[in-house]
């Protein structure tokens, strides 16, 4: 693979699926604030004029689901019927039930350290030294473009922007190293009064140029800004949204494998979420320690069982020390049982709403992004 292209995409906080993710995680956070041991599996569906919140929740906490939903939509920016969705007037339906006692008996144990996994499943974590946050560049810059779209929309720089947007960036690689950006796609919802030429110029100057490094842009880079020419109808009016439908956007943009489990709305007893975070933490510390340039971790679990049923480490031939040393380091320095990883990453806190837009990884404010084990790993591996 001497020369190749690789593409990832992202979506904004106003994309219908991301509205759903943020509502689900807002509910989770509100419950964890009162009851850190709650069991939460919250799903959301949004469509024109309506939000349905459902799932299984077992908790001693009380949360005003309707007001929380409206506040979340309001923060995103859907506050007027002209946008096709209005936080103040949309219907909010609540269909939440309790978690099955059959699941509880496998998860809850007398000794917390023996807490079983909330379900079976496989989870992947990944890191590479392509960017300063040890994430693949295509997904990193796709996120940054739609983050910038939200910033200039909310601060009034481009007041005619609306909340729904998508980005996509294609990078050129040679011998596994970035040599440039081949293509950029950015589609953004807008009000009816802005012309397409004015929109394209403003998006280029205020969003794309400030975000993408100039050294990766050339005369051959292709830019596609609102390529259909018009994007007035968007958000839940354009498409329905569902929790958990942007799992590749949430993770590595397709640069690493995915176990299939979504994150948003799930408390940390659900290993779909917590073990994926732990796998990222392990992979990132291995790369930060200089043990490998790229690292992918796979974990698997059985419902009600504490220890992972398997741990896989893949370094794609980039390892700087023997594979056996890396595997032994993972076993020695990372507790990957459900209780252990919750404690290791301090997951029983209300930090999840922020994760629900612009990616769960590569953002230093989250505990699974810490590289606090890198020094231990270096010492263990004898890396100077």
From Swiss-Prot:
Chain sites annotated for binding Mg(2+): 17
Organism classification: Bacteria, Pseudomonadati, Pseudomonadota, Gammaproteobacteria, Vibrionales
Record's subcellular location: Cytoplasm
Biological role: Catalyzes the formation of S-adenosylmethionine (AdoMet) from methionine and ATP. The overall synthetic reaction is composed of two sequential steps, AdoMet formation and the subsequent tripolyphosphate hydrolysis which occurs prior to release of AdoMet from the enzyme.
Pfam families per the UniProt record, alphabetical: S-AdoMet_synt_C (PF02773), S-AdoMet_synt_M (PF02772), S-AdoMet_synt_N (PF00438)
Keyword Electron transport annotated: no
Binding-site residues, L-methionine: 56, 99, 239, 270
Catalyses which reaction(s): L-methionine + ATP + H2O = S-adenosyl-L-methionine + phosphate + diphosphate
Cofactors demanded by this protein: Mg(2+); K(+)
Gene Ontology cellular component terms for the protein in this record: cytoplasm
Protein name as it appears in the record: S-adenosylmethionine synthase
Binding, K(+): 43
Region feature (Flexible loop): 99-109
A single MF term (Gene Ontology): magnesium ion binding
InterPro entries: ADOMET_SYNTHASE_CS, S-AdoMet_synt_C, S-AdoMet_synt_central, S-AdoMet_synt_N, S-AdoMet_synthetase, S-AdoMet_synthetase_sfam
Gene3D superfamilies on file: 3.30.300.10
Biological-process GO terms, alphabetical: one-carbon metabolic process; S-adenosylmethionine biosynthetic process
EC id: 2.5.1.6
Annotated family: Belongs to the AdoMet synthase family.
CDD domains, A to Z: S-AdoMet_synt
Species for this entry: Vibrio parahaemolyticus serotype O3:K6 (strain RIMD 2210633)
Keywords: ATP-binding, Cytoplasm, Magnesium, Metal-binding, Nucleotide-binding, One-carbon metabolism, Potassium, Transferase
Pathway info: Amino-acid biosynthesis; S-adenosyl-L-methionine biosynthesis; S-adenosyl-L-methionine from L-methionine: step 1/1
Cysteines engaged in disulfide bonds, as pairs: none
Enzyme class (EC, first level): transferase
């Amino acid at each position: 693979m001497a020369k190749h292209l690789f593409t990832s995409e992202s979506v904004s906080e106003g994309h219908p699926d991301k509205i759903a993710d943020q509502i689900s995680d807002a509910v989770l956070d509100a419950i964890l604030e009162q009851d850190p041991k709650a069991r939460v599996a919250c799903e959301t569906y949004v469509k024109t004029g309506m939000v349905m919140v459902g799932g299984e929740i077992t908790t001693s906490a009380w949360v005003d689901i309707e007001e929380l939903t409206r506040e979340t939509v309001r923060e995103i920016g859907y506050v007027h019927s002209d946008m096709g969705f209005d936080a103040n007037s949309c219907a909010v339906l609540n269909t939440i039930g309790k978690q099955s006692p059959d699941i509880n008996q496998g998860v809850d144990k007398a000794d917390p350290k023996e807490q079983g996994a909330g379900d079976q499943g496989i989870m992947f974590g990944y890191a590479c030294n392509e960017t300063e946050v040890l994430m693949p560049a295509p997904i990193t810059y796709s996120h940054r473009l739609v983050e910038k779209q939200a910033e200039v929309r909310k601060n009034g720089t481009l007041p005619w922007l609306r909340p729904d947007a998508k980005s996509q960036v294609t990078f050129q690689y040679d011998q596994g190293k970035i040599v440039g950006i081949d293509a950029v796609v950015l589609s953004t919802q807008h009000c009816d009064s802005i012309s397409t030429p004015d929109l394209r110029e403003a998006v280029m100057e205020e969003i794309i140029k400030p975000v993408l490094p100039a050294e990766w842009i050339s005369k051959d880079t292709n830019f596609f800004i609102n390529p259909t020419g018009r994007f007035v109808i968007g958000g839940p009016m354009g498409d329905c949204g569902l929790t958990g439908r942007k799992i590749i956007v949430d993770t590595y943009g397709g640069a690493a494998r995915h176990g299939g489990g979504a994150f948003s709305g799930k408390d940390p007893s659900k290993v779909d979420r917590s073990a994926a975070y732990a796998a990222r933490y392990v992979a990132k510390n291995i790369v930060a320690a200089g043990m490998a340039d790229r690292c992918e971790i796979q974990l698997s679990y059985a419902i009600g069982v504490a220890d992972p049923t398997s741990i896989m480490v893949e370094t794609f031939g980039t390892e700087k020390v023997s594979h056996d040393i890396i595997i032994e380091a993972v076993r020695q320095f990372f507790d990957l049982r459900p209780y252990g990883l919750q404690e290791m990453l301090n997951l029983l806190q209300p930090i999840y709403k922020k994760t629900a837009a612009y990616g769960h990884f590569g953002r230093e404010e989250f505990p699974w992004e810490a590289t606090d084990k890198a020094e231990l790993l270096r010492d263990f591996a004898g890396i100077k």
